[in-house]
């Protein structure tokens, strides 16, 4: 259970970063691979503990000049570190991993090696490349495993900063959950290790960056792209929910794009296993929070369905449906489910979004119903997989 101080219900703090829409922050976030850059002049997006200012990548070394930390962070819980990675010969250069059969072979090779060899990773096993992202707790770098030449993303987090923010448990949860998930639309966590001052997460590299950055670049998406992304996300969430995992922080900043433009869910820091199917902690981005969470009521996996509706709206319109200049106004709009559609949003899209943004969570469409919705079927270029995604991705596990 998250600590009380993680709750979003606190006074807003003005952002001073000159990039992107002004964001009201409560605390900071572990960095993702690709920080989004946004245009100015937009209303504030109210953020909760899982968010931070997206600072443009800065070239710096991840290991130099760091003083030892007296207080040690206990080793992260979860699976043992993954073994030495392996991939096809073509991955010798720092480029996106191949898709299709080559990608399946890479994943199969990795898993076989994981099963046959168990070892402790160290920083010496990797060649460190350019920075991909920078955040409050550390940085993300493009990296290459020396022996196999496998290209990946290495998230480097500083223990002293994790301790000061009191988010060790959040990191442990992210490692525990994400390392066990196998789906083509979920970013893979291969393993982790740590030294005296840092924690390292070995992640799949998503070369096309965040959906947030792409959305800011294009202002909004067309119906075909939106429906395709919603299909991929619904497939991934269906898989997560079948594993009793609730993400709780679905938003453009936490969605990455693979080499073929496929969507990948990342940042599972606010996700939870759901043995009781209920969690009451308020977390994530306020714009994407459902009424039951901001009102402090019990909630289940249906919170992700609400976020799916908000996401679909933002993809088509270019801004979240409940966005306002103040925390209080955003809160009020969500509680009353007050939003309107621009004239250019089609009837099919309006129907889907309206049936997801229901105050009563039991009245929201299920993920299966989302995948079978006429607007999705008419516009998406990807087929639904739902719970069958496990079978479809067995080769990559």
Curated annotation (Swiss-Prot):
Belongs to the protein kinase superfamily. Ser/Thr protein kinase family. Aurora subfamily. The modification Phosphothreonine is found at residues 280-281. Induction: Activated by progesterone. GO terms for biological process: anterior/posterior axis specification; apoptotic process; cell division; centrosome cycle; centrosome localization; cilium disassembly; liver regeneration; meiotic cell cycle. Detected in neurons in brain cortex and hippocampus (at protein level). Expressed in mammary gland and tumor. Residues 273-286 are annotated as: Activation segment. SUPFAM superfamilies: Protein kinase-like (PK-like). This is Aurora kinase A. Keywords: ATP-binding, Cell cycle, Cell division, Cell membrane, Cell projection, Cilium, Cilium biogenesis/degradation, Cytoplasm, Cytoskeleton, Isopeptide bond, Kinase, Membrane, Microtubule, Mitosis, Nucleotide-binding, Phosphoprotein, Proto-oncogene, Serine/threonine-protein kinase, Transferase, Ubl conjugation. Residues 1-118, 378-397 are annotated as: Disordered. The gene is Aurka. Disulfide bonds: none annotated. Residues 29-55, 84-102, 378-387 have a biased composition (Polar residues). Its main location: cytoplasm. It comes from Rattus norvegicus (Rat). Mitotic serine/threonine kinase that contributes to the regulation of cell cycle progression. Associates with the centrosome and the spindle microtubules during mitosis and plays a critical role in various mitotic events including the establishment of mitotic spindle, centrosome duplication, centrosome separation as well as maturation, chromosomal alignment, spindle assembly checkpoint, and cytokinesis. Required for normal spindle positioning during mitosis and for the localization of NUMA1 and DCTN1 to the cell cortex during metaphase. Required for initial activation of CDK1 at centrosomes. Residues 126-376 form the Protein kinase domain. It is found in: Cytoplasm, Cytoskeleton, Microtubule organizing center, Centrosome; Cytoplasm, Cytoskeleton, Spindle pole; Cytoplasm, Cytoskeleton, Microtubule organizing center, Centrosome, Centriole; Cell projection, Neuron projection. The modification Phosphoserine is found at residues 40, 50, 335. Activated by phosphorylation at Thr-281; this brings about a change in the conformation of the activation segment. Phosphorylation at Thr-281 varies during the cell cycle and is highest during M phase. Autophosphorylated at Thr-281 upon TPX2 binding. Thr-281 can be phosphorylated by several kinases, including PAK and PKA. Protein phosphatase type 1 (PP1) binds AURKA and inhibits its activity by dephosphorylating Thr-281 during mitosis. Phosphorylation at Ser-335 decreases the kinase activity. PPP2CA controls degradation by dephosphorylating Ser-52 at the end of mitosis. Ubiquitinated by CHFR, leading to its degradation by the proteasome. Ubiquitinated by the anaphase-promoting complex (APC), leading to its degradation by the proteasome. Ubiquitinated by the E3 ubiquitin-protein ligase complex SCF(FBXL7) during mitosis, leading to its degradation by the proteasome. Ubiquitinated by the CUL3-KLHL18 ligase leading to its activation at the centrosome which is required for initiating mitotic entry. Ubiquitination mediated by CUL3-KLHL18 ligase does not lead to its degradation by the proteasome. The active site is at 249 (proton acceptor). There is a cross-link at residue 251 (Glycyl lysine isopeptide (Lys-Gly) (interchain with G-Cter in SUMO2)). It catalyses: L-seryl-[protein] + ATP = O-phospho-L-seryl-[protein] + ADP + H(+); L-threonyl-[protein] + ATP = O-phospho-L-threonyl-[protein] + ADP + H(+). GO terms for molecular function: ATP binding; histone H3S10 kinase activity; molecular function activator activity; protein heterodimerization activity; protein kinase activity; protein kinase binding; protein serine kinase activity; protein serine/threonine kinase activity.
């Amino acid at each position: 259970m998250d600590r009380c101080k993680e709750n979003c219900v606190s006074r807003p703090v003005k952002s001073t970063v000159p990039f992107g829409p002004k964001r009201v922050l409560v605390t900071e976030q572990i960095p993702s691979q690709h920080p989004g850059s946004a245009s100015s002049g937009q209303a504030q997006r109210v953020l909760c503990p899982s968010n931070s200012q997206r600072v443009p990548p800065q070239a710096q070394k991840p290991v130099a000049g760091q003083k030892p930390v007296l207080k040690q962070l206990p080793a992260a819980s979860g699976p043992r570190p993954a073994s030495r990675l392996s991939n096809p010969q073509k991955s010798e250069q720092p480029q996106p991993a191949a898709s299709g059969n080559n990608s399946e072979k890479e994943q199969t090779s990795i898993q076989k090696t994981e099963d046959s060899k168990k070892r402790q990773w160290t920083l010496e096993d990797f060649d460190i490349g350019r920075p991909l992202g920078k955040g409050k707790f550390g940085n993300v770098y493009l990296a290459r495993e020396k022996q196999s030449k496998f290209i990946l993303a290495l998230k480097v987090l500083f223990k002293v900063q994790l301790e000061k923010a009191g988010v060790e448990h959040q990191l442990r949860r992210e490692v525990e959950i994400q390392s066990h998930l196998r789906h083509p639309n979920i970013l893979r966590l291969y393993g982790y290790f740590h030294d005296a001052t840092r924690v390292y997460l070995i992640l799949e590299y998503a070369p096309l960056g965040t959906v947030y950055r792409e959305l800011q670049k294009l202002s909004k998406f067309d119906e075909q792209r939106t429906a395709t992304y919603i299909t991929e996300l619904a497939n991934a969430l269906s898989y997560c929910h079948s594993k009793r995992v609730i993400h709780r922080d679905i938003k453009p900043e936490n969605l990455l794009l693979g080499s073929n433009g496929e969507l990948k869910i990342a940042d599972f820091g606010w996700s939870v296993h759901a043995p009781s199917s209920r969690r009451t902690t308020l977390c994530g981005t306020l714009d994407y929070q459902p009424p039951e969470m901001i009102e402090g009521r019990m909630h289940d996996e249906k919170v992700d369905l609400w976020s799916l509706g908000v996401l679909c709206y933002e993809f088509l319109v270019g801004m979240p449906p409940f966005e306002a200049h103040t925390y209080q106004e955003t809160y009020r709009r969500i509680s009353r489910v007050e939003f309107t559609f621009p004239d250019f949003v089609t009837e099919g899209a309006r129907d889907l979004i309206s049936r997801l943004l229901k105050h009563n969570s039991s009245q929201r469409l299920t993920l299966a119903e989302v995948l079978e919705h006429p607007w999705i079927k008419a516009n998406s270029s990807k087929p639904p997989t739902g719970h069958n995604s496990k079978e479809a991705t067995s080769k990559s596990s």
